[in-house]
Amino acid sequence: MKIEIGDKEYNVEVARTEEEKVKGLQEKESLGEDEGMLFVYDEPQEIAFWMKDTAIPLDIVFMDEDGEVISVKQGQPYDETLLEEDGVMYVLEVNQNSGIQPGDELDMEDDDDDSQL
C-alpha cells in the first residue's frame, strides 16, 4: 500500500491481525528507503512497541485516529525498552532519521482494498 506522510511517500506492508503486529519487522535484515510497516488498530488506545528481535534502527511514528502524528520515537536494534504512547490508532515503522515530525498527517492512497482501513 502507498502512503504519504510529511513530504515523503512510502510503500508499506499493513499489519492488521495480532499475529502480523507481533511479528512486525522482526525478520527483516534491511528496509528500503521508501519502505515501512503500518500497524492499524480498531480504536485509539495506549500502544507500546519494543525492538527486542528487530535488527533495523527505526523511527516508530505514533498517530491518532485522524492520522496526525502524535510522536516519533527512535527504536534501537534489539533494545527491550518500551516505547509507548496513548491515543494511538496507527503506528508507522520506517528507517530512522525519516524526518517525520509531530503534526505531520498520514494520507493513504486508494490503489487497492488496503485503503479500507
Model-flagged regions — what are they?
Residues M1-L117:
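Compact, glycine-rich, soluble single-domain proteins
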